[in-house]
Structures are given as structure tokens and as C-alpha cells.
Amino acid sequence: CFAGMYIVCESWLNDKSTNETRGQMLSLYMIISMGGLGIGQMMISTGAENSMALFILASVLVSIAVVPVLLSATGAPNFEEPERMSVRRLLQVSPLAVIGLGLNGVAVSMLFGMGAVYGLSIGLDSSEVGYFMTAPVFGALILQYPVGRLSDRFDRRMVIMGVAVVGGIAAGLATLFGKGEFALLLVCMLIYGGSLFPLYSLCIAHANDFLTPRQMVAAASGLVMVNGGGAVLGSPLAALSIEFLGIGSFFVMITGLQALIAAFALYRMSQRAAVPNEAQGPFVAIPESSSAIAATLNPEAEWIPSGEEIAAEDDPFHDNPYVN
């Protein structure tokens, strides 16, 4: 249901945006989406985590949010399915983007699926668990822009590797702190979130460096699917790890995922020359929970409706010196 809501909302935003306002619209969407995610985590602090109250509250809030749309006199947008690009094709275009987004989906799912369980297991109370889960989201809001600026100035693969290493170190240090060092634990979570969430946008931006505007939305569909596939695996893997290896394995697994992303980025740097800075597209922050439709809010992207014939020049491998 929520996936459908994201698609509808993003289609509406895309329909009402112009080329001059798409960047602003995506920025506002990013801030509202991440802000809502952070506030939602704080609801754990109410102490109602063992009842259905929070689920009921979420249902009520979603229902209330629909009311202004129903009362609006504005017509519904013309929904069209975007052209898709296969995962196999994406692996040929940008292996790092595909692998990075898949592992990133696993890590995010682990954090939000079992993070609260970890917090309670190390002795945090409900209020502290709320802060523990909110810190990564606000870390993402704080560090998203600086990370994006760095990726526009340097080889994006180097930035992906650096961000993954920093996130891995922060996650590793988090295992050393508990209730008695709660402030230090929050700092680690803030830094970890500031590296985890920007990786999503970094990988998409890296893939876009090899694509034309008409290919970006098609590629986003496949990349979102890869990230979603990783997210499906994350929570069960974290649960199995905690059950068989103990609660201490939670951040060990997350650190391992960050290390894999960094190692693969380093490997890819040895396999393909960097895209020159002047040929790179700008970094565009995209919410982790968005659908492929959000890619259309990127001012550089161009929509290709499903079924429309793709010209030869729209093939990522057509006259592209950076794909090999």
C-alpha cells in the first residue's frame, strides 16, 4: 500500500512540476520525507511499542493526509508507466551502482527492522531507543549536501568508498557503547546515518554519469528494484544473525556490508577510468524510500513512456566512451 502511495504522490509531483521547479520540488520532497521518517522513529519514545497504538496512529495520519487531496479541485495527473532497463543491462552500465544499492538496501532494512530490538537489548529505555533510531535520519539530513558536493568535485567512486568506510567505522564503534555511553552511541549513529543514506543517492548519481537524460528514469526503475530486493533480505538476515550469533553481531554485519561496498568501489576504480568532472551530472539527493517516479523530478532526467520505441542513441552503449 505504501509503495503505491509513493508512486501516486511522486507522479502527482512530477505532473505539477516544471523544468524550472523540479530541483526545488525534489529538495522539498527529500526534506519532508526524511523529516517524517525521523519523527516516526521518535514515536517509539511514547512507550507504546508493545501495543497496536502506533500502527493505528499511522493509519489515522495517512487517512488525514488524503483529505486535502480529495478536497482539491485539481485534476489527477496522467499516469504513465516509465520505460524500464533490465538489471543485467544496469550491471553492464554501472556494476558499482547495482551492487552498492543492493547492499545499501540490506543495511537500511537491518537498521530499521532490528535497530529498535538492538537498542532494547543493550538496556536502552523507550525514550532512548527513539533517539537512537532518529539519530541516523538527522545525520543524513545534515551530511547529505556536503557528501553530494564532494561527489560533484571528485571521482564519485572514491566518495562512495570513503563514505562507506566512514559508515563502517561508525557502526563498528557503536558496538563499544551502550546505555552508559549513550551520548557517544548517538554520535556514532548520527555519523553512520550520514554515510548510509547518501550512499543511495551517490549510487544513482554514479549510474546517471553513464546515461543520457532519456535513460535516467528507465535506469531508476531497475535500481529501485535492486535496492528493494536488498531491503527484503535485510531484516530476516539481521534477525537470524541475532538469534544464532547474539546481539553483538548486529553492528558487525552492518560494518561488513559497508566494507563490501568500499571494497567493491575500490575494485571498480581499477577496472574503469573515472568519468571526468566536466562530464559528470550534478548530485541529486533522493529519499531512500522513494519509487522510480522520483527520478523524474531530477531536472536532468527525461521521461520515456512504456512502449515508446527507444532510439539507437538512447542505448547506454551507443557512442558512450565511459562504458566499457
Which residues are covered by each model-predicted region?
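Intrinsic disorder in cytosolic terminal tails and internal cytosolic loops
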Residues: 77-87, 268-324
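A membrane-interface helix-boundary motif in multi-pass transporters
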Residues: 45-61, 240-258
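Loop-to-transmembrane helix entry/capping segments in MFS-fold secondary transporters
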Residues: 19-29, 126, 211-223
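Helix-to-loop junctions at the C-terminal end of transmembrane segments
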Residues: 48, 143-155, 242-243
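Pair of pore-lining "gating" transmembrane helices in MFS-fold secondary transporters
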Residues: 90-111, 190, 194
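Intracellular juxtamembrane helix-capping segments at the cytosolic ends
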Residues: 4-17, 197-212
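Structural signature of the two symmetry-related core transmembrane helices
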Residues: 59, 158-173, 252-255
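C-terminal membrane-cytosol helix-exit motif in multi-pass small-molecule transporters
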Residues: 44-45, 59-79, 261-269
